[in-house]
Amino acid sequence: MKVAYWGNCRKSGVTCALTAIGLTAVLTYPFKITIFENHYSENGVLRYLFPRKWPYCVAEPVHHYREGFFHENQHRMQNAGSMADYPVIELLEKGLYYVPQFTKNADLFDYQFHCNLMPVLKRYSEIAFIDTQRGNALSSKMILEEADVVVVLLKQDMYEIQSFFQNYSSLIPRAFFIISDYQRKSKNNLAKIISEFGFRKDCIGVIPHSEEFQFAAGYGRMIEYISTNYVGKGTREDYYFMQELKKTTFLLMQKVAFDRRLGEVF
């Protein structure tokens, strides 16, 4: 089951949402989820999971990986046939995994992902969350076309939402929508958005604005924040944030794992 996370505008919160939902899903359900990124970014998934002062802290939980793996063994990639041929970081034990970026050269990463990881991803039978670049990445169009579910990150802005419907209507049948950095006191609240655009309530969720969450994520402590607040031990705002994150995760995973017969969103 391939789940592409994508946004139709800049700074829509794709990577942060993918990471938060991946963590919440494996804490809630007995799933195995592997995270992929189809583009190089210094602000990728690991930014939210590990403090920046510990750049090599992921060394111990890495499987099939050592420093320089891809540079030394790129010839193996041409003949690789499964995920066993690629490095995988175990983020949460027996639940959440991550395929790390293997070069800081954005063009090389784009090319290698398209040529070598896309064939593996096509055959991948478990749940894959894919941070999908908007724009001209070689693999982005293919990922969006072949994904079982496309998680569309939207800003809480009526113009931006309208822009999605005008320009990307082909994604609607497989889409699950998330309003990122959601402000519940905004005049453009979820009820108004649903009414204005006709969303089905089971196909849209929110990730609320939270200073504490943003602070934790910015310092690489998202795992700690979500794990600590998962059982509701934080402040009232923390509780509200986690309840909405859990609800959004539940709605998405219903579509991903429990409803294999993907129907029309509208």
Model-derived segments and spans:
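Walker A/P-loop phosphate-binding motif and the immediately C-terminal alpha-helix
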Residues: K2-Y48, H114-L117, L121
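NTP-binding/hydrolysis catalytic cores, primarily Walker-type P-loop NTPases
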Residues: I223-F266
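Loop/turn-to-beta-strand initiation segments
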Residues: K94-L96, K122-I130, V149
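P-loop/Walker-type NTP enzyme "switch/lid" segment
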Residues: I35-V120
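Conserved beta-strand segments of the P-loop GTPase G domain that flank and frequently precede/overlap
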Residues: Y5-W6, F36, P100-Q101, F129-D131, ...
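Beta-strand-loop-alpha "switch" segments that mediate conformational coupling across diverse proteins
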Residues: D181-Q183, K187-G232
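P-loop/Walker A phosphate-binding loop and immediately adjacent motor/lid segment at beta-alpha junctions
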Residues: A106-C115, F164-K187
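Inter-motif core of Ras-like GTPase G domains
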Residues: A137-D157
